[in-house]
From Swiss-Prot:
Biological function: Catalyzes the reversible conversion of 2-phosphoglycerate (2-PG) into phosphoenolpyruvate (PEP). It is essential for the degradation of carbohydrates via glycolysis.
Endpoints of the signal sequence: none
Species of provenance: Dehalococcoides mccartyi (strain ATCC BAA-2266 / KCTC 15142 / 195) (Dehalococcoides ethenogenes (strain 195))
Positions annotated to bind (2R)-2-phosphoglycerate: 164, 338, 367-368, 389
Name of the gene this protein is made from: eno
Pfam families according to UniProt: Enolase_C, Enolase_N
Record protein name field: Enolase
Pathway(s) it belongs to: Carbohydrate degradation; glycolysis; pyruvate from D-glyceraldehyde 3-phosphate: step 4/5
Residue sites binding Mg(2+) per the record: 243, 286, 313
Cofactor list: Mg(2+)
Annotated catalysed reactions: (2R)-2-phosphoglycerate = phosphoenolpyruvate + H2O
PROSITE patterns: ENOLASE
Subcellular location: Cytoplasm; Secreted; Cell surface
Amino acid sequence: MSAVVKSIKAREILDSRGNPTVEADVVLSDGSFGRAAVPSGASTGSHEAVELRDGDKSRYNGLGVQKAVTNVNTAIAKAISGFKASDQQGLDNLLIELDGTPNKAKLGANAMLATSLAVAHAAAASCHMPLYRYLNNCDEYILPVPMFNILNGGKHASNSTDFQEFMVMPTGAKSFAEALRMGTEVYHSLKKVLKGMNQNTTVGDEGGFAPSLPTNKDAVEVILKAIEKAGYRPGEDIFIALDPASSELYQDGKYTLATENKTLSSAEMVDYWCGWVEKYPIISIEDGLFEDDWDGWKMLTKKIGSKVQLVGDDFYVTNIKRLERGIKENASNSILIKLNQIGTLSETIAAIKMANNSAWTAVVSHRSGETEDTTIADLAVAMNAGQIKTGAPCRAERTAKYNRLLRIEEELGGKAKYPGKEAFFNLK
């Protein structure tokens, strides 16, 4: 007989920024246990599912999540008691129905996701399987190429570049373990380069360095220098990936690049990126344009979509309806996958499958406010996503995911494949 949900208990814990978030523990009828904690973003898309916060200024500056915790411990607990744990789709549908709003505003996406993931972990334990195998039991798995966010700017750091993330991707590695080593060596090399320039080497929310560089181009230049000093070839062993988080730069129909003293139209921003792609070994640009600049996105995809991965994060917010439109209108060629943008495991998996079925890539991602939860590592492997974005190789909430992937690769042995540049299967 399949195990059913016996109990669920949620609590308020802290994320890596010292803000409260929701954690849930699930126990099944056969004694199996599952735990999950929910992350939180700093630059959030306006179309994301609602993260329920208390708004009580006397506690945690209004950022408490007691309402979401109470929703799990009362309404959700009552609804899922006795529910078959292995029916993930059914469970998530029940949560969506119970919430009854289009954006999960009643129960909170944080309450719903903690429940959804904790049940999945418990169900995997009940089957005596690691989570990745429980989600997709197959003969061979693809380990993800990591996007290491080694230089932070924008909303993830103060006094830094306009653009939020400058990343490196070790496509030339033969295994995930080697990719992790390469990325880490570049990270330490970057620290030395920055120190040599008398630059600040404190780290931002995601573990990347947050120096005060005069322009956005300087960030790319120092990373190229760091790659070479670590003994690697930019554009061969290691490529650059960017997340400018352009919605944060957009106001009144224009993009403002404060460090460059520039105000650009949508068409000019597209040309700006085309210029960068010509000049630097850039393989991926995430949120290169404002989340509702559909015409700009289509223009960018038309111009460079065959040679650069164009990832929609705030643009799609892991939402199938927005993704469907993006596919139909050829607005990009990739989607960023964040569990808490949509609020259930089933909807997240559906978004990955929809992207893959349209020959789009899907990049599984953390948030800037993370916990020690490693679900996304298992999800990336289970879905054979081929790419993961989970910060710098620094700060325990980031390295927890990388270390989980190391263990998975070791466990799989010859059944694990590291895709390298093949992760970008839709580029020419």
